[in-house]
Every structure is written in C-alpha cells, then in structure tokens.
C-alpha cells in the first residue's frame, strides 16, 4: 500500500541504499526476498510459503490482503522496502524488506487476542490435521503477543528479510530503524520475535528481550526471543506485560 506522505520519510544512506513505502506491484519481487530468508523454515513451508509459481502467487495475495486490512486502520505504510539504486544505470533493485503493523489508535482490549492474518494459518488445508498442526505450532507466538500487547498502542514487526547478496551491508538495520523512528514519533512500543540471525540488528536498534517464545514443530523446538523497543520516557514500572499472570 503506497502512502504518498510516507515517501517524505525516505532516508538515504551510503552505498546508494534508501527506504521507501512498498507498493502492491513490488510484491512479486519482495516475495523472492522473503523466500530467500524464511523459505527453509518448516512452519513457513507448511503454511504454503514455498518457492513454486502457485506458492509465490498465494503468498503474494496473503501479504497484500494483510496490507489492505492494515490500511483500513492507519495511513502509515505496512510494507517497507530497502532499494539499491545503481549509480551508473539508475536501475532500482529491492534488496531488503520489512513489514510493520502499526496500531497507533487505542485498540480494543481483545485486539491482539486474534492472530495477525499472516500467522492465522486459516488457509492451510484441514486434511490430515495439517491446519491444526500449524496453528498449534504458532499458538505460543500468538499467546505471547496477547500477553504483552493486550489493549496497547503498539507496532508489530512481522518480517525483516534481505537478499542474500546484500546481507551485512546495512539494509536490515535501515528497515528496522525506519519503524523504530516511526514508533518514537507516535510514542508507541515496538514488538517482534527474533530469529538468531536478526537479534544483533534488533539490539542495535534499541530492542530488549522480554521473554523467549518456544515453538514446537514435529518434536523440534525453536526458540525465538520476544523483544520490545519501548518508547522514550517509558517508566520502568510500565515495562511489564499488559496481562499479568494471576
């Protein structure tokens, strides 16, 4: 969803990289970057995020639908792309991508009790218990978000990915920093679950670990730290879950 106002937030950095709001017609290119980072994960594969023509098409449509739903709540862009502009030819290539779901208006208390469309798994076939299996694997993620975000203004960083040829050159940091700056402007918290590869980027951008999310897939447990970047001025006593354990 392109937001003309968001383009004024473009940040230029060395090596001809810049940040822009992603457009719907960017999604075909972005899908390739997403698959290069997450396509190896069994749960992503089980959800149909696979590198086939049919898988790519379905994946694009799911993300675009999530963008459209998000656009009903805010004019802040959801998809953020990092673009390399060739200094000789002027050709632009999407080398990185992040997906920020920003909820700057006070949500209903139950807002985060339902899964974001991209992790609901409702499209997974029911045959053989596949949907139930996927949703069970994702439940710890959904429960942790509910615990920390219930009723709060916040932003959820769903995906950060970089083309393999462009990793460790600042693209991921730029994508994350864009959202952190926006959250600071709005005075809201930013939340994510980190992969092992991404943790150092998030820490550098101000995120701190609040707990570990453990997801089980066919007996193999993956651990993904839940991390929060609190807005400036947040009191220590307020840096607690929205829903406290009884």
Question: Which sequence ranges carry the predicted segments?
Answer:
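Conserved GNAT acetyl-CoA-binding A-motif
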Residues: 153-155, 182-194
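A short helix-loop-beta-strand connector motif used in the catalytic cores of GNAT acetyltransferases and
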Residues: 58-85, 105-108, 129-133, 150-156
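Conserved GNAT-fold acetyl-CoA-binding loop/helix
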Residues: 40-65
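Conserved acetyl-CoA-binding loop of GNAT-fold acetyltransferases
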Residues: 205-212
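Conserved acetyl-CoA-binding loop-helix of GNAT-fold acetyltransferases
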Residues: 162, 168-181, 204
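A short beta-loop-alpha structural element at the N-terminal edge
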Residues: 18-32, 43
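Conserved acyl-donor/pantetheine-binding loop and adjacent beta-alpha core of acyl/acetyltransferases
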Residues: 89-161, 167, 215-222, 234-246
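A structural microfeature
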Residues: 94-96, 172, 211
